[in-house]
UniProtKB/Swiss-Prot annotation:
Keywords: Ribonucleoprotein, Ribosomal protein
Lineage: Bacteria, Bacillati, Cyanobacteriota, Cyanophyceae, Acaryochloridales
InterPro entries with a match to the protein in the record: Ribosomal_bL36 (IPR000473), Ribosomal_bL36_sp (IPR035977)
Family annotation (PANTHER family): 50S RIBOSOMAL PROTEIN L36, CHLOROPLASTIC (PTHR42888), LARGE RIBOSOMAL SUBUNIT PROTEIN BL36C (PTHR42888:SF1)
Alphabetical list of PROSITE patterns matching this protein: RIBOSOMAL_L36 (PS00828)
Protein name listed in UniProt: Large ribosomal subunit protein bL36
NCBIfam families noted in UniProt: rpmJ_bact
Gene name of this polypeptide: rpmJ
UniProt KW Magnesium keyword: no
Gene Ontology CC terms: cytoplasm; ribonucleoprotein complex; ribosome
Listed GO biological process terms: translation
Stated family: Belongs to the bacterial ribosomal protein bL36 family.
Amino acid sequence: MKVRASVRRICEKCRVIRRRGRVMVICTNPKHKQRQG
C-alpha cells in the first residue's frame, strides 16, 4: 500500500474508488495499491 498525496491509475486494471471518505486505488497487481493521505 502506497500512501500518496495524489493517487492515479498506473495500469488498465487499476480502479479508483472511495472508501470511508478516502480515495483509493485497487488493482490485481498488489504493487499498484494506493491510498490518499
